Amino acid sequence: MRDVARLSGVSTSTVSAVLNGNVPVSPKRKQRVIEAMTALDYQPDAVARSLKTGKTNAIGVVVPDITNAFYPEVVRGVEEAAQLLGYSVLLCDSREDPKTEETHLAALFSRRVDGVLLACCANSVAYDAMVRRRFPMVFVDRLPVTTAEATVSTDNVHAGYLAAKHLLELGHERIAVVVGNLALSPHRDRLEGFRKAMQESHVPVRDEYVMCGNVQVDDGLIAGNSLLSLSMPPTAIIVNNNKLSLGVLQVLDERKIAIPEELSIVGFDDYIWNRYFNPGLTAIAQSTHEMGKRSFELLLQIINRSPGDELPQPHIRIAAELRIRHSTAPARPTDPIPTQPPS
């Protein structure tokens, strides 16, 4: 620890504060300490710390769907931040099932992890159970209906607003949105942002243009076919999840609908393959790695705080970014989009 302090130009107590997360450290000093630890390949002695503090130096992470590319990126951010401070990470996948989620949380509790990061599934009962146990927890991405003590997520209201505003500025008014499950906070919030942008522009939201359901590829197929079978189909679609986007894009390809000449589309989550679609997909990018990193840092504050201490920033909202490619274009008068798939 002395070597880390010497190289980073801070005191050993500052290094200890960075490691334990129990005392605020300025971002600049914290970064110097982390860079020194990396340069020296410094690894805190987990066993010694555990004996001294009574903690296991392990946390649990429970995600609802590990096959969704969003969550591995979040977990990577968690693991990188945790590894620097000598913490191990136990990863569980609830597979969108509340019972499985409950089983995983009970197992993590029995293993005496120091805390849990949870992206809850729909109809989750985890919050009440963990509050009863007074267990350190941060909700990540998907937030409970009940007000939680600590949360980290994208600013999803603004993200939904950005997507709609982009299409409105291109002159679109017949804008549909494939929302996903409204029991999940990101989809509720994105729909709220969408409605806010439409209201500001005095463009009515047509009920038949709001498609709610689950968040898998097949749900995108169903939503896409339903929208394009309307007597007056939309000229633009916002899709609120990367798996849903794949389903909608498949429908557009099967119906041979030209993007963006006949229909504009905005997706959510900006992964590398979005650049290689033809045309490249305009998308709302979320800072998934940053979300994971800041979630771990917030959990560490909860784990190490003294009784009665308040968290300096218990609810963190991370800005999303609109990345414009070639799947969106100005609205223009055209013949109606075909309402029946090709034979």
Residue spans of the language-model regions?
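N-terminal helix-turn-helix DNA-binding module of bacterial transcription factors
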Residues: 1-57, 342-343
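Bacterial carbohydrate/catabolite-sensing allosteric modules
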Residues: 7, 39, 80-85, 109, ...
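Short beta-strand segments enriched in small/hydrophobic residues
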Residues: 7, 12-17, 52-67, 166, ...
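Amphipathic helical "hinge" segments at domain boundaries
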Residues: 27, 42-107, 111-115, 192-195, ...
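Short gly/ser/thr-rich secondary-structure transition/capping motifs
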Residues: 39-45, 99, 118-121, 221, ...
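Short hydrophobic/charged patches on amphipathic alpha-helices used for structural packing
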Residues: 48, 102-105, 127, 164, ...
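Short beta->alpha connector loops
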Residues: 95-98, 119-124, 243
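Acidic, Gly/Pro-rich loop/turn segments at junctions of secondary structure
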Residues: 117-127, 139-148
